[in-house]
């Protein structure tokens, strides 16, 4: 369904772009659609009213049609800003068809090198980023004029413009892309200097720059939305004329809508946490005396991946497998003997419940029955979703990861020498990304065939995202694992060079991080590529999990010893946003930022 609206502010970039017509979506030629259309008036006094009107429309209670609209390329800068705003506020899914139409038209204008895109630095950078992420073939060479700081007049551009260039530079998908590499170097240096010298008087803009610079690729989707909502200031930014052809949803209304949407998702996340805790208790996992209890962590990570209430089964399946994989990994590492660890693998291969006395220990019984009952339940649900049985696949994924756990256990306990390649050839599976993604993907609303799941593309997606998470994890757990005599990629890099020019720990860590970056870019290449066997909706899951790895292991081990995560968990799962009536957001003496019919 489509929602038409008016905006007269750019709530984040602060960069003012005037549009002569401001129609949204954009089409050079007339477009006629019979899709339902809702007009949300500024007379709405609460976000609840606004959400109610939108829900009524989505439920088909309003029957109108969108008239033919003729737009011009001059509207593109304004429309791209609106898309960026919708994405940052986390409500772009309600406007996906309009966004797709705009980006289709923007790509056509990009190919024609229209002045409306290429003459403004902010628009140029934003168009490049939005198009590349969507999968359009856009060359970074078009940004070459901005690649060298010496060629950019910093007296004529502001911090928000540099932010857009910085964000564009983050979409480098190949090591050879010197344009984006150079663009990243100078924009990141410039923005860091702005922070160090306190040169950004706007507090919210200062916080935004700091947030981007800390860990850009570790910004989890919903945490980014929460931060954007916190930094949204309807009274600060200059007005933007927009959307005469659309109805009157003012900037304050959009904020109220986005905040209400966030709170609805948050309530769902709290409900899912209760379901996880109940499942955890039912499985008797809370009685285990060893290992990590990551129920709240898994709920946070899956909630941060996606806020769509309709994807609850995806999040729950993913979270349950984070918990199960972690518990069994800890059992293999510390909780049980080698023989007991082998026993779990044998039980999963056999896939048959036994009398309690035949498991050998209560811990083995609890772990196996937790996997057995959870997988059987998910298999039944997935059968309905997929229209076919996927139980064998789910069991196979468990046999695979447990077999790798066994190999790693044997390797480190027997003190077997490994090369880095030998280690990575199996350890990317044991990080758990593959099993969590492929099982939860069954509930994404996409029919997954054997051809898709057994394809080289699927293997590459799984391997690249897992390599990122594995390598970054190794960097942060290197010291702990060295003390436990369980090597990882960093220790293997050090060992590999002992007969050559010796490298120190810092150099080994840098090499591991570089290898993680290489795999992250390879993952982006597959995800952004169009016409592949997996639809984009599926491939996006791999990118989301990649961000989880970057989030968890950028400066510590947030998974095992969460610190920043505890604060983020509060804001994402527990602390709702306070929503004020739209009128209350108006600044005294300033006209309401709405356009009337």
Swiss-Prot record:
Motif DDXXD motif, residue range(s) on this chain: 329-333
Alphabetical GO biological process terms: gibberellin biosynthetic process; miltiradiene biosynthetic process; terpenoid biosynthetic process
Family statement: Belongs to the terpene synthase family.
Keywords annotated in UniProt: Chloroplast, Lyase, Magnesium, Metal-binding, Plastid, Transit peptide
GO cellular component term of the entry, any: chloroplast
Transit peptide feature, positions: 1-51
Residues annotated for Mg(2+) 2 binding in this entry: 329, 333
Residues binding Mg(2+) 1: 329, 333
Organism annotation: Isodon japonicus
Catalytic activity: (+)-copalyl diphosphate = miltiradiene + diphosphate
Domain notes: The Asp-Asp-Xaa-Xaa-Asp/Glu (DDXXD/E) motif is important for the catalytic activity, presumably through binding to Mg(2+).
Role summary: Involved in the biosynthesis of ent-kaurene diterpenoids natural products such as oridonin, miltiradiene, eriocalyxin B and nezukol, known to exhibit antitumor, anti-inflammatory and antibacterial activities. Catalyzes the conversion of (+)-copalyl diphosphate ((+)-CPP) to miltiradiene.
UniProt-recorded name of the protein: Miltiradiene synthase KSL2, chloroplastic
Essential cofactor(s): Mg(2+)
Pfam family, one: Terpene_synth_C
PANTHER family: CIS-ABIENOL SYNTHASE, CHLOROPLASTIC, ENT-COPALYL DIPHOSPHATE SYNTHASE, CHLOROPLASTIC
One MF term in the entry's GO annotations: magnesium ion binding
Cofactor remark from the record: Binds 3 Mg(2+) ions per subunit.
Annotated residues for binding of Mg(2+) 3: 473, 481
UniProt KW Lyase keyword: yes
Location of this chain's protein in the cell: Plastid, Chloroplast
Keyword check for Transferase: no
EC identifiers of the protein: 4.2.3.131
Recorded metabolic or biological pathway in which this protein acts: Secondary metabolite biosynthesis; terpenoid biosynthesis
């Amino acid at each position: 369904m489509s929602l038409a609206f008016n905006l007269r502010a750019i709530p984040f970039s602060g960069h003012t772009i005037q549009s002569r017509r401001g129609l949204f979506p954009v089409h050079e030629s007339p477009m006629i659609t019979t899709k339902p259309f809702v007009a949300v008036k500024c007379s709405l006094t609460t976000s609840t009213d606004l959400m109610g009107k939108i829900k009524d429309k989505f439920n088909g209670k309003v029957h109108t049609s969108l008239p033919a609209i003729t737009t011009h390329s001059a509207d593109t800068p304004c429309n791209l800003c609106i898309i960026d705003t919708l994405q940052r506020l986390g409500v772009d899914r309600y406007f996906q068809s309009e966004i797709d139409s705009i980006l289709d038209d923007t790509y056509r204008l990009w190919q024609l090198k229209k002045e409306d895109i290429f003459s403004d630095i902010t628009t140029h950078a934003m168009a490049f980023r939005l198009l590349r992420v969507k999968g359009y073939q856009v060359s970074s060479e078009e940004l070459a004029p901005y690649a060298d700081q010496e060629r950019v007049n910093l007296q004529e551009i502001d911090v928000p413009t540099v932010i857009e260039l910085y964000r564009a530079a983050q979409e480098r998908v190949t090591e050879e892309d010197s344009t984006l590499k150079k663009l990243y170097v100078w924009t990141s240096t410039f923005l860091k200097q702005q922070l160090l010298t306190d040169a950004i008087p706007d507090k919210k803009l200062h916080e935004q720059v700091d947030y981007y610079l800390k860990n850009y690729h570790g910004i989890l989707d919903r945490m980014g939305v929460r931060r954007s909502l916190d930094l949204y200031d309807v009274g600060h930014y200059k007005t933007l004329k927009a959307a005469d052809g659309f109805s009157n949803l003012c900037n304050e209304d959009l904020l109220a809508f986005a905040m209400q949407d966030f709170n609805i998702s948050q309530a769902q996340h709290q409900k899912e946490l209760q379901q996880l805790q109940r499942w955890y208790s039912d499985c008797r996992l809370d009685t285990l005396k060893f290992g990590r209890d990551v129920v709240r962590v898994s709920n946070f990570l899956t909630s941060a991946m996606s806020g769509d209430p309709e994807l609850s089964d995806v999040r729950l399946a993913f979270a349950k497998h984070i918990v199960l994989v972690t518990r069994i990994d800890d059992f293999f590492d510390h909780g049980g003997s080698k023989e007991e660890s082998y026993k779990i693998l044998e039980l999963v291969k056999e896939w048959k419940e036994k009398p309690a006395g035949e498991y050998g220990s209560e811990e083995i019984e609890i772990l196996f029955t937790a996997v057995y009952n959870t997988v059987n339940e998910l298999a039944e649900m997935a059968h309905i979703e997929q229209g076919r049985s996927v139980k064998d696949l789910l069991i196979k994924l468990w046999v695979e990861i447990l077999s790798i756990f066994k190999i790693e256990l044997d390797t480190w306990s027997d003190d077997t020498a490994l090369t880095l390649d030998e280690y990575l050839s199996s350890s990317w599976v044991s990080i758990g990304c593959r099993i969590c993604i492929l099982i939860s993907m069954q509930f994404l609303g996409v029919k997954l065939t054997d051809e898709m799941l057994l394809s080289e593309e699927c293997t590459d997606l799984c391997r690249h995202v897992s390599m990122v998470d594995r390598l970054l994890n190794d960097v942060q757990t290197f010291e702990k694992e060295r003390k436990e005599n369980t090597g990882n990629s960093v220790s293997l890099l050090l060992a590999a060079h002992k007969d050559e020019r010796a490298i120190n720990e810092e150099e080994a860590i840098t090499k591991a991080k570089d290898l993680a970056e290489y795999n992250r870019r390879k993952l982006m290449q597959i995800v952004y590529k169009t016409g592949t066997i997996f639809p984009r909706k599926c491939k996006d899951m791999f990118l989301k999990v990649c961000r989880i790895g970057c989030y968890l292991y950028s400066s510590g081990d947030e998974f095992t010893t969460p610190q920043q995560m505890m604060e983020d968990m509060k804001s994402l799962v527990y602390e709702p946003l306070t929503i004020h009536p739209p009128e209350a957001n108006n600044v005294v003496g300033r006209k309401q930022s709405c356009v009337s019919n």
